[in-house]
A protein has these predicted regions:
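Extended, helix-rich architectural segments
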Residues: 1-330
């Protein structure tokens, strides 16, 4: 149904504006930009960052000779470890990572409330200390520390088995827009009597149902992004002037369904392999991530490559490229 609505919307837009870009053309442009950014990160940037990780760990260079010293200098690690406490102290030595300053007496209460709220969101609700620590360390070792903040529009799903519901209870539950029902079985509440049979009356039905409640669980999310998951246009001088900025990651079908995507469509895209296993930076940083001990048989936990892209594109044909968010799953 959703695809039919999108197709109809595209047809209407094309009739109104012949220069309007349809979904297929947009998908082609986004796909080409993403492929180019992946090639840039995986083949140009990641090998350099992987080498920096090896220097940090003091791993052998591979040119050692028998009878010669095998000692590797740990200068990179020592320098990073010496800088980290000072960096963390700047932001975490006090109780307030962020403080809002009032412009006048009337703003004092609001500024205090905003300060308490933002600090709670960052420090308590999102483990701000660990977020900063990860990003700072990535920046010192791998030249890039990425922190992502956004409103997480995830949903919480709860499934319950309910038995013995009468018609009124079933109707009440069916009227709840957050609940979807699957009737498992229906049966008479009691045996039909002879008198009821003579009057043509039937015994009321009881129902056993499976109820799935889907509730929004939105919150501010702040997280450190592994450098190899961050994609950017190779021509960009900064995030602001980049034609494409994207976050790629491997998620499960369950994660995507919780985001609101169609279950059947996501299951058709799932696989048992991880496309990022070939990234040398990821392997160097944590070889265990590329080692699979067992494949999950349940479809909900199968893997899907998910890319959240922000791209500048002129879709409405007015000659001005707008920033658009396009999410791609494969």
């Amino acid at each position: 149904m959703e695809n039919e609505i999108n197709d109809l919307t595209n047809e209407v837009n094309e009739l109104i504006n012949p220069d309007y870009m349809d979904d297929d053309e947009l998908q082609g442009i986004v796909g080409a930009e993403i492929d180019d950014a992946i090639d840039f990160i995986d083949n140009t940037v990641s090998p350099i960052r992987a080498k920096a990780t090896e220097y940090y760990r003091g791993e052998p260079f591979g040119d050692e000779e028998d009878g010669r010293s095998q000692v590797v200098s740990m200068d990179v690690r020592d320098t990073v470890q010496a800088i980290m406490p000072s960096l963390m102290r700047i932001f975490t030595s006090g109780d307030k990572v962020v403080e809002f300053v009032p412009h006048g007496p009337e703003d004092v209460a609001m500024a205090k409330q905003a300060t308490e709220y933002v600090n709670y969101i960052f420090q308590k609700d999102n483990q701000g200390f660990l977020v900063m620590h990860s990003a700072f360390k990535d920046a010192l070792i791998r030249k890039n520390g990425v922190i992502k903040f956004y409103w997480d529009e995830s949903y919480e799903t709860q499934t319950s088995e309910l038995t013995g519901l009468d018609d009124m209870a079933l109707a009440t539950l069916s009227g709840d827009p957050t609940v979807s029902l699957d009737i498992v079985s229906s049966y008479p509440a009691f045996e039909q009597t002879e008198e009821m049979a003579m009057l043509g009356q039937e015994a009321p039905l009881l129902h056993d149902v499976r109820a799935t409640r889907r509730m929004p669980k939105g919150k501010v999310k702040i997280e450190a992004v592994p450098p190899e998951e961050f994609l950017i246009d190779r021509r960009a001088k900064s995030i602001e002037d980049a034609q494409l900025v994207a976050h790629r990651r491997v998620v499960t079908v369950s994660d995507l369904v919780a985001m609101g995507y169609d279950r059947d469509e996501m299951e058709s895209l799932a696989s048992d392999t991880d496309e990022m296993d070939m990234n040398v930076e990821r392997y160097t940083r944590n070889p265990a991530l590329t080692t699979s001990t067992a494949d999950r048989t349940d479809k909900a936990m199968r893997k899907v490559s998910y890319i959240e892209a922000y791209i500048k594109v002129d879709r409405d044909g007015d000659g001005i490229a707008e920033l658009r968010k396009v999410c791609v799953a494969a």
